[in-house]
Amino acid sequence: MKNTLNDFKNQGVVPDMVQVGNETSSGILWDEGKIGGDYTDFTQLAELLNQAISGVRASVGNQTKIVLHLDNGGNNSLYRWWFDGVTGCGFDLDFDIIGLTYYPMWHGTMDDLQYNLNDISARYNKDVMIVETAYAFTLADGDGLGSSFSPQDEEIGGYPASVQGQKDFMSDLESVILNVPGNRGLGFFYWEPEWIPVEGAYWGTE
């Protein structure tokens, strides 16, 4: 990681943020950094995260924000369990942002998300960001391979699979983020528009 960031820095493109791991609810680098089930000791995971963070800081210092990211954004008990665990091992993890994945058909209601964002931003004194989210604008099969978004997902998600339904979801999500106390809600990243099978997208048309 340090070498990669040094390459970026040498080209004058220091990243605004670095996410250490992706959806790390079950840890990283199994089995050494695994957590959950029979793996109840966070020490090795915290040490791995600490080393990765140290590499980022050694390269780009504090100008780059560091994100720790879990899935299941409406599950407050998961976030308390995980962040209590990794911050309670004596490593004083130097991170700036808690990143969450949130899909309403899988991860609870907007109220669940709001509660979690409010709680963890205050409990850990960190900014929060939705680093992965999306909602379907159609139930149609766009590429002949079947749709990953079903009528059942639409029902659970609570918004029509339409352009307006997608817009309403994003508007409501924005409101939830803006309502986090102390301006701790930073925004969201949408996942992932390059997988829409438009003309010229080789994977979807060839």
What are these regions (language model features)?
Residues 37, 58, 119-122, 138-206:
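Aromatic-rich peripheral "rim/lid" segments of glycoside hydrolase catalytic domains that contact
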Residues 18, 98, 132, 166, ...:
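Conserved, mostly hydrophobic/aromatic
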Residues 1-88, 93-95, 108-117, 199-206:
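Active-site cleft segment of glycoside hydrolase catalytic domains centered on the general acid/base Glu
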Residues 83-148, 160:
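Flexible, glycine-rich surface segments
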Residues 20-25, 69-73, 100-105, 133-136, ...:
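Active-site beta-loop-alpha junctions enriched in small/polar residues
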Residues 66, 97-99, 154-158:
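A generic short-segment signal for beta-strand/edge and adjacent turn/coil regions
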Residues 64-65, 127, 187:
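Proline-centered loop/turn at the N-terminus of a beta-strand
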